[in-house]
């Protein structure tokens, strides 16, 4: 019979258990490592370090952000960009997919790029996207261009994840520097004198390209007006087959700005001698969407590009970039890349494990308190009169019930932690409805977003349900597409009606019959 194997005294409790997952580098890159002798960033070193989840010294991060901002500040509201060019849509903090984008679209060293905004929020690697793109902007200021998206603002980054990410990975100083840099981003680009490129779309207050050039962009985007519309507006869902002749209608999905119609786009294109509008702002199952062709040019009047594959890790969509060269437009699609895992909302492992500890502690407390029987309680209270003794006994019972209720809450948190996080992720505040945890497992499983936002209910949703389609994911995430509440006043319906009447009186009565196009001829 063999002797039991002795425990290796050299076994370290600090060694990484799963060695296949490398530990992020603890060393933060210095200015000497990131910048060469000419002050230009070494983007290859930066890329390799960021892909390992490495970080920079705070002063280095601030230098990249501020130097990039100084270049952006010198650019015009409306950029003039020549072909060939590769146009990219939303990134949303998906840094590892951004690296795949550059593989598909071509190296920034010899490829002209135009990004349409939304570099941050929702994904867990937003600051990496900003640092890398800003470093590329410093290195290639004349061939890499960045526009502003609706998420490049204080209001949304505080509401969603970017501010929290900056504070966890760097500091609030880095976040504030990013906000100042976002204020410098141009609003639009005129590509090859043929295409207007923006993040969202048109505005009833923008009739010519000069209207864009005249805007004051160096500020936090307002809740309404032309700057807001450029960043927030969307085409109508039935674009090209509208049942109304109105050019602009209130955007009920976003809670701000407008939906614009096919006649509105065609009139704008004809008035400004343009071929099409390129925009981002909306997730697409195929990574892109081409809308109804213009009757005068035969070219799609509107094209949407979305460059974040498997958006939020649940949409299961493809991403795409648009390459335009020699008057030929090609769409290149790509799928998502593996990325490191973060607990939801940047939760640390101690917070994650707290329900397990809490359940056991409360369970022990309940067991200790339940050792005392009713007879023992009665014998200890012989010195009190009947009313006082009964009151004391009821107080003790209530305390036991309260701890028992707390034990149930921790039990639910432990058993249903994934369900809790799923539900929190579907609410704009990241908070659960009151009473869900104390109601137990059944209450949690039947909880819906309707309990949090009645007007945006997703009826019948259960965390155990697996999302199986792009449309289902988009529907569940719909509440997060809205502009968060803010104090700015919105224009009245009367103003909107007067705008539409003026536009309708000027239109040439464009025929609204036709079908959407998915190919360019």
Swiss-Prot record:
Disorder named in the UniProt entry: Epileptic encephalopathy, infantile or early childhood, 1: A form of epileptic encephalopathy, a heterogeneous group of severe childhood onset epilepsies characterized by refractory seizures, neurodevelopmental impairment, and poor prognosis. Development is normal prior to seizure onset, after which cognitive and motor delays become apparent. IECEE1 is an autosomal dominant condition with onset of seizures between the first weeks and first years of life.
Organism ancestry: Eukaryota, Metazoa, Chordata, Craniata, Vertebrata
Phenotypic consequence of residue 288 to N/A: Loss of Ca(2+)-mediated transcription factor NFAT activation
Residues that coordinate or bind Fe cation: 90, 92, 118
Name of this protein: Protein phosphatase 3 catalytic subunit alpha
Region (Catalytic): 56-340
Topology relative to the membrane: Peripheral membrane protein
Self-association and partners: Forms a complex composed of a calmodulin-dependent catalytic subunit (also known as calcineurin A) and a regulatory Ca(2+)-binding subunit (also known as calcineurin B). There are three catalytic subunits, each encoded by a separate gene (PPP3CA, PPP3CB, and PPP3CC) and two regulatory subunits which are also encoded by separate genes (PPP3R1 and PPP3R2). In response to an increase in Ca(2+) intracellular levels, forms a complex composed of PPP3CA/calcineurin A, calcineurin B and calmodulin. Interacts (via calcineurin B binding domain) with regulatory subunit PPP3R1/calcineurin B.
């Amino acid at each position: 019979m063999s002797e039991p194997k002795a425990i290796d005294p050299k076994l370290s409790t600090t060694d990484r258990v799963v060695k296949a997952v490398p530990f992020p580098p603890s060393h933060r890159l210095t200015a000497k490592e990131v910048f060469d002798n000419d002050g230009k960033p070494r983007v290859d070193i930066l890329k390799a370090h960021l892909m390992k989840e490495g970080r920079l010294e705070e002063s280095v991060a601030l230098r990249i952000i501020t130097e990039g901002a100084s270049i952006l500040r010198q650019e015009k509201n409306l950029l003039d960009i020549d072909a060939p060019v590769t146009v990219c849509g939303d990134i949303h903090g998906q840094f590892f997919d951004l690296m795949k984008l550059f593989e598909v679209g071509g190296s920034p060293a010899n490829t002209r790029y135009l990004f349409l905004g939304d570099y941050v929020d929702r994904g867990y690697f937003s600051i990496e996207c900003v640092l890398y793109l800003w470093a590329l902007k410093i290195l290639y200021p004349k061939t890499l261009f960045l526009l502003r998206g609706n998420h490049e603002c204080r209001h949304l980054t505080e509401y969603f994840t970017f501010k929290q990410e900056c504070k966890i990975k760097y500091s609030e100083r880095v976040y504030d520097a990013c906000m100042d840099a976002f204020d410098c981003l141009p609003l639009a680009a005129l590509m090859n004198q043929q295409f207007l490129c923006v993040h969202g779309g048109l505005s009833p207050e923008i009739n010519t390209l000069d209207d864009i050039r005249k805007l004051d962009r160096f500020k936090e985007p307002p809740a309404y007006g032309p700057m807001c519309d450029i960043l927030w507006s969307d085409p109508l869902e039935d674009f090209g087959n509208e049942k109304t002749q109105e050019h602009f209608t209130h955007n009920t999905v976003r809670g701000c700005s407008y939906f614009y119609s096919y006649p509105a786009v065609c009139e704008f294109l004809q008035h400004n001698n343009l071929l099409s509008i390129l925009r981002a702002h909306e997730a697409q199952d195929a990574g892109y969407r081409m809308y109804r062709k213009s009757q005068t040019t035969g070219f799609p009047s509107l094209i949407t590009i979305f460059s974040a594959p498997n958006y939020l890790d649940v949409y299961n969509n493809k991403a795409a970039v648009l390459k335009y060269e020699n008057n030929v437009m090609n769409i290149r699609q790509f799928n998502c890349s593996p990325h490191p895992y973060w607990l939801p909302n940047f939760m640390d492992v101690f917070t994650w494990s707290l329900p397990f500890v809490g359940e056991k502690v409360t369970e022990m407390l309940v067991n200790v308190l339940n050792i005392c029987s009713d007879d023992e309680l009665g014998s200890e209270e012989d010195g009190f009169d009947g009313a006082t003794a009964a009151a004391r006994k009821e107080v003790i019972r209530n305390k036991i019930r309260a701890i028992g209720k707390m034990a149930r809450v921790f039990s639910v948190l432990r058993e249903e932690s994934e369900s809790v996080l799923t539900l929190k992720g579907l609410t704009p505040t990241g908070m659960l409805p009151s009473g869900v945890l104390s109601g137990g497992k059944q209450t949690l499983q039947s909880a819906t977003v309707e309990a949090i936002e009645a007007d945006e209910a997703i009826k019948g949703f259960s965390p155990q349900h697996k999302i199986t389609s792009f449309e289902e994911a988009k529907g569940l995430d719909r509440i997060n597409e809205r502009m968060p509440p803010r104090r700015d006043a919105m224009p009245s319906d009367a103003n909107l009606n007067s705008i539409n009447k003026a536009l309708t009186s000027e239109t040439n009565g464009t025929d609204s019959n036709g079908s959407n196009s998915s190919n360019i001829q």
